[in-house]
C-alpha cells in the first residue's frame, strides 16, 4: 500500500531519510506516526529507524546529539527541526519485565519491527510513501483491532507496561482488543507490580484523557489490572462509578480526571493516594483543590472567598465535572463572581507588611500576619476598597 498524500510532518523530514539513503543505508518512518497518518489523525512525533549504526548516522549529519546512543538513538538537527533516528535493533532477555538485558544493532528492518508491541504500531513508511506491513497491521487497522505482534504473552513478558499501553491505545483509538491479546494481558496483569509507578501513571493518565476512555477503563476493570495498581486493590465496584458520568463526557485535564477517579474510589486521604502514585506536589495540590471545590458546591453556591481561594480554571473544571455527574451547575455565576473580585492574589493588595512595620509600628510575627489577612478578606468580601487611603483609614480605626 502507498500513501496517496504524504503528511506535511513527513515531508519536512524527507531530507533526513534521503541523506541516509544516499549514504547507502535504509531509512523509514516508523511507529505511531505512521499509524496516525493512516488514520488521518494528527501526527505528534516523527520517528525514524535506519540500518545505519549510531556512529554511521553521526557521520552523515553535521549536527547531532547523543540522547540515547546506547539504545541506538541519535538526535538529528535539521534546520529548526529535531528528529530521533534509531538504529534497527533486537533485544535480549528482559530484566524485571521492564528492560532488555542487552540491545543489539542489526541491519534488518524485520528484526526491528517484530519486537514492537502491537501490529498497528509496527508499520514502516519509506520515502516514496510505500507502507511496509509485515504483521498484517493494515488488516487490523481496517478491522479496528489491537493485536500483539507475534506471540502476545512474549510481548507482555518483555515489558509489562505494554499491558497498560494496550488499555491506553484502546482508549485513544477506540479499537477492540483481539481475544488472544486480551487473554495474555489478563493473565499477566500481576507483572504490573514490577513496573515503576511513574511509567504506569503516564499510561493511566493518557487512558483517562483519551476520547474512548470508557472502553480502555472497561477492559482494565475486566482484566482486574487495578489490583496491581497503587492503592486500588479490590476497587472494581467503585471504579464502575466513573461510568455514571455523562455518556459523552471527556476529561478536560489530568487534574480533573484524577479528581474524578478519587471521587469514584471514595478516597478519604487524597494526599496519601496521590503520594503513592508519586505525582508532583503541584499536581496533587490541584487535584485536592478540585475535590475541595466539589465538596463546597455540595453545600450550595460558592462564596466570594471560595472564588478568591481557587483559580478560575479549577472552579470551572469542578463545575464541568459536576455537570457530568448530573448535578445542577451555574458556570456563568461562578465566572461573574470571580471577575467581580477586586483582587485575585495577596500581591494585588495596595499595602504590604513592610508598610505596616514602617508606618504603623507593627513587628514581624503573628499579629502582622493576622492584620494582613484581615485586610485581605475585608477587600475580598467587598467591605474595604483596595486603595491606600481606604486601607489607611481602616488601620487607623483598628488602632
Swiss-Prot record:
It holds the Pfam family tRNA_NucTran2_2. Belongs to the tRNA nucleotidyltransferase/poly(A) polymerase family. Bacterial CCA-adding enzyme type 3 subfamily. Its EC number is 2.7.7.72. CTP binds at residues 32, 35, 116, 159, 162, 165, 168. It catalyses: a tRNA precursor + 2 CTP + ATP = a tRNA with a 3' CCA end + 3 diphosphate; a tRNA with a 3' CCA end + 2 CTP + ATP = a tRNA with a 3' CCACCA end + 3 diphosphate. This is CCA-adding enzyme. Homodimer. Its cofactor is Mg(2+). Catalyzes the addition and repair of the essential 3'-terminal CCA sequence in tRNAs without using a nucleic acid template. Adds these three nucleotides in the order of C, C, and A to the tRNA nucleotide-73, using CTP and ATP as substrates and producing inorganic pyrophosphate. tRNA 3'-terminal CCA addition is required both for tRNA processing and repair. Also involved in tRNA surveillance by mediating tandem CCA addition to generate a CCACCA at the 3' terminus of unstable tRNAs. While stable tRNAs receive only 3'-terminal CCA, unstable tRNAs are marked with CCACCA and rapidly degraded. ATP binds at residues 32, 35, 116, 159, 162, 165, 168. Keywords: ATP-binding, Magnesium, Metal-binding, Nucleotide-binding, Nucleotidyltransferase, RNA repair, RNA-binding, Transferase, tRNA processing. Mg(2+) binds at residues 45, 47. Gene3D superfamilies: 1.10.110.30, 1.10.246.80, 1.20.58.560, Beta Polymerase, domain 2. Disulfide bonds: none annotated. GO terms for molecular function: ATP binding; CCA tRNA nucleotidyltransferase activity; magnesium ion binding; tRNA binding. HAMAP family: CCA_bact_type3. GO terms for biological process: RNA repair; tRNA 3'-terminal CCA addition. It is an enzyme of class 2 (transferase). A single active site specifically recognizes both ATP and CTP and is responsible for their addition.
Amino acid at each position: 500500500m502507498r500513501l496517496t498524500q504524504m503528511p506535511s510532518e513527513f515531508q519536512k523530514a524527507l531530507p533526513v531519510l534521503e541523506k541516509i539513503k544516499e549514504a547507502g543505508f535504509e531509512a523509514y518512518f516508523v511507529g505511531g506516526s505512521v499509524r496516525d497518518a493512516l488514520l488521518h489523525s494528527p501526527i505528534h512525533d516523527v520517528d525514524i529507524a535506519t540500518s545505519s549504526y549510531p556512529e554511521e548516522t553521526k557521520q552523515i549529519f553535521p549536527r547531532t546529539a547523543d540522547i540515547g546512543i546506547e539504545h541506538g538513538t541519535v538526535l538529528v538537527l535539521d534546520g529548526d527541526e529535531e528528529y530521533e533516528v534509531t538504529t534497527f535493533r533486537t533485544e535480549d532477555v528482559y530484566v524485571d519485565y521492564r528492560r532488555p538485558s542487552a540491545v543489539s544493532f542489526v541491519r534488518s528492518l524485520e528484526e526491528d519491527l517484530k519486537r514492537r508491541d502491537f501490529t498497528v504500531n509496527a508499520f514502516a513508511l519509506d520515502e516514496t510513501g510505500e507502507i511496509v506491513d509485515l504483521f498484517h497491521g493494515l488488516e487490523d487497522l481496517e478491522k479496528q483491532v489491537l493485536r500483539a505482534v507475534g506471540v502476545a504473552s512474549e510481548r507482555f513478558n518483555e515489558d509489562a507496561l505494554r499491558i497498560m499501553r494496550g488499555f491506553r491505545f484502546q482508549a485513544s483509538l477506540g479499537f477492540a482488543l483481539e481475544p488472544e491479546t486480551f487473554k495474555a494481558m489478563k493473565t499477566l496483569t500481576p507483572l504490573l507490580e514490577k513496573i515503576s509507578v511513574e511509567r504506569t501513571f503516564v499510561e493511566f493518565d493518557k487512558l483517562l484523557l483519551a476520547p474512548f476512555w470508557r472502553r480502555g477503563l472497561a477492559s482494565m476493570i475486566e482484566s482486574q489490572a487495578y489490583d496491581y495498581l497503587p492503592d486500588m486493590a479490590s476497587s472494581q465496584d467503585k471504579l464502575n462509578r466513573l461510568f455514571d458520568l455523562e455518556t459523552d463526557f471527556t476529561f478536560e485535564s489530568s487534574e480533573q480526571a484524577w479528581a474524578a477517579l478519587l471521587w469514584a474510589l471514595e478516597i478519604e486521604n487524597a494526599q496519601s493516594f496521590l503520594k503513592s502514585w508519586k505525582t508532583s506536589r503541584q499536581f496533587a495540590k490541584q487535584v485536592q483543590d478540585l475535590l475541595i471545590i466539589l465538596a463546597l458546591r455540595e453545600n450550595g453556591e460558592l462564596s466570594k472567598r471560595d472564588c478568591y481561594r481557587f483559580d478560575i480554571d479549577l472552579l470551572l473544571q469542578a463545575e464541568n465535572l459536576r455537570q457530568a455527574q448530573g448535578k445542577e451547575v451555574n458556570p456563568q455565576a461562578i465566572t461573574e463572581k470571580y471577575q467581580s473580585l477586586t483582587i485575585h492574589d495577596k500581591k494585588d493588595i495596595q499595602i504590604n507588611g513592610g508598610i505596616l512595620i514602617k508606618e504603623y509600628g507593627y513587628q514581624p510575627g503573628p499579629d502582622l500576619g493576622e492584620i494582613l489577612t484581615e485586610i485581605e478578606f475585608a477587600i475580598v468580601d467587598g467591605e474595604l476598597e483596595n486603595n491606600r487611603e481606604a486601607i489607611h483609614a481602616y488601620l487607623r480605626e483598628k488602632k
